[in-house]
Swiss-Prot record:
Residues covered by region (Disordered): 272-301
Organism classification: Bacteria, Bacillati, Cyanobacteriota, Cyanophyceae, Synechococcales
Source species: Synechococcus sp. (strain JA-3-3Ab) (Cyanobacteria bacterium Yellowstone A-Prime)
Pfam families: RecO_C, RecO_N
Keyword Zinc: no
Any GO CC annotation of this UniProt entry: bacterial nucleoid
Function: Involved in DNA repair and RecF pathway recombination.
Protein name: DNA repair protein RecO
Matches recorded under InterPro entries: ARFGAP/RecO (IPR037278), DNA_rep/recomb_RecO_N (IPR022572), NA-bd_OB-fold (IPR012340), RecO (IPR003717), RecO_C (IPR042242)
Highest taxon listed in the record's lineage: Bacteria
Gene name as annotated: recO
Coiled-coil features, chain-numbered ranges: none
GO term, biological process aspect, one: double-strand break repair
Family: Belongs to the RecO family.
Keywords tagged on the record: DNA damage, DNA recombination, DNA repair
Gene3D superfamilies given in the database record: Nucleic acid-binding proteins, Recombination protein O, C-terminal domain
Amino acid sequence: MSGVTYRVTGINLKAMPLGEADRIITILTREQGLIRAVAKGSRKQLSKWGGRMEPFVVNDLLVARGRWSAQTDPSQCLQRIAQAETLQSFPRLGRSLAHLTAAQYLAEVALLLALPNQPQEELFVLLVEHLERIEQAPATEAVLPLLVHGLYHLLVVGGVAPSVQACYSCGEELAGEAFFSPHAGGLVCDPCRLAQRLSPVAWVSSSVLQALGSLPNPTLPSLAERALPLASWLAAERLLRRVLELHADRAIRSAGLLASCYSVPVAETLPPTPSGQGSPVAAAAFSEEDSETLGSNLKKL
């Protein structure tokens, strides 16, 4: 196949060094989904690219496909960025570790859910929208609910979102307390849990249930209006994360710093398992932490 060029709009999600001066950039585009392209010279101090190849930068790109045989899968071939014009960036994501952690988390989720060589308009628009909301968050406490909200909406687009308002089995609206099974489909009422003998499951408190129930809404209430403990949002994040990790068969490395960002002991973020309710295995299932730090993860971007 002879080399051709094409234009796309994309956001930089990941970068890897290539040789002494270049980078391989992984980009989520509206038109072609995930693409990997070489930005030649982007590691040089006086690179012509400036900041255009940095993470979370949205560019209008001219990409050269390169040359390969007809038997080669294009998704496995490196392309080359010929031109880039910045359309949007998120400089205020660097104001705190919490902002950076949340942005990197959503970028990692998008990488897991995006498909190559096909349009990803909805995923692209949704990711940019939630990064904008996180960037505008005035305080660390406001970031976490926005992260969980964005995570849920990305799972919806990816077709793997769990039930968060009603029992996935019987459809009954839930209030007070409930259970959560990442393997079975999300929230489940006690009668269905017992009838189906689900294990492991996590017991979900009323505050965590309230956090989960707000996620399908287009926007969250203001920080003053929602007034839920940070531990409830951390617990909700862990439940959603477990669903994604089961689907992707890999850990979300960016989640490692969430608890430390908010000074909440890990034990407080775990849905408790009262005596006779749920399975003690649930605590272990939802307490695995990745050993990677955000710092090492950001270096890979």
